[in-house]
């Protein structure tokens, strides 16, 4: 399936159950990483992984895999940049490539794609409102975007699981 055909996954589908999740915001220079608590309620920033597009050894993917192992993640959520018209953005190809490389390294832990429209814009706004100057944003913007991606997934997952329970209880 081509990148243009890749749609975001649905939270709660094929859910692995309780456990930490890792959220990833793929950028060309930096990759933001966030983690959830074991109950999947709250996303928090973890780190920013440096990335060199000329590096063909995949050092950034190895670091991401090490974080998945360190946090004992049951699921990884990678932001999939889509345009407002719901098409794959230029960055989507890169995000899918990183997600696929990571999936090969951490199998059988599932790697999901989540719609990340406007997460970086939202992260910049949040940092600006918190009084963080533009210069200081560079260091944390990717982590804040990863938190946004993961928190959105966690919230949608919780709603999907609750709806599923209501459907079986009724």
Curated annotation (Swiss-Prot):
Name of the protein described by the UniProt record: Putative pre-16S rRNA nuclease
Entry's family note: Belongs to the YqgF nuclease family.
Organism: Mycolicibacterium smegmatis (strain ATCC 700084 / mc(2)155) (Mycobacterium smegmatis)
InterPro entries, per the entry: RNaseH-like_sf, YqgF, YqgF/RNaseH-like_dom, YqgF/RNaseH-like_dom_sf
GO biological process: rRNA 5'-end processing
Enzyme Commission numbers on file: 3.1.-.-
Location within or outside the cell: Cytoplasm
Cellular component, GO, one term: cytosol
């Amino acid at each position: 399936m081509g990148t243009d055909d890749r749609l975001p996954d649905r939270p709660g589908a094929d859910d692995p159950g309780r456990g930490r999740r890792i959220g990833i915001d793929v950028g060309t220079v930096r990759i933001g990483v966030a983690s959830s608590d074991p109950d999947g309620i709250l996303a928090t920033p973890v780190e920013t992984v440096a990335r060199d597009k000329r590096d063909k050894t995949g050092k950034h993917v190895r670091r991401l895999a090490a974080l998945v192992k360190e946090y004992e993640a049951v699921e990884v959520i990678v932001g999939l940049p889509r345009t407002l018209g719901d098409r794959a953005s230029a960055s989507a190809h890169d995000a899918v490539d990183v997600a696929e490389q990571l999936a090969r390294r951490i199998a059988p832990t599932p790697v999901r794609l989540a719609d990340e429209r406007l997460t970086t814009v939202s992260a910049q706004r949040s940092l600006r409102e918190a009084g963080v100057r533009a210069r200081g944003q560079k260091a944390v913007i990717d982590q804040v975007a990863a938190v946004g991606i993961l928190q959105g997934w966690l919230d949608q997952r919780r709603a999907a699981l609750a709806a599923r329970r209501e459907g079986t209880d009724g």
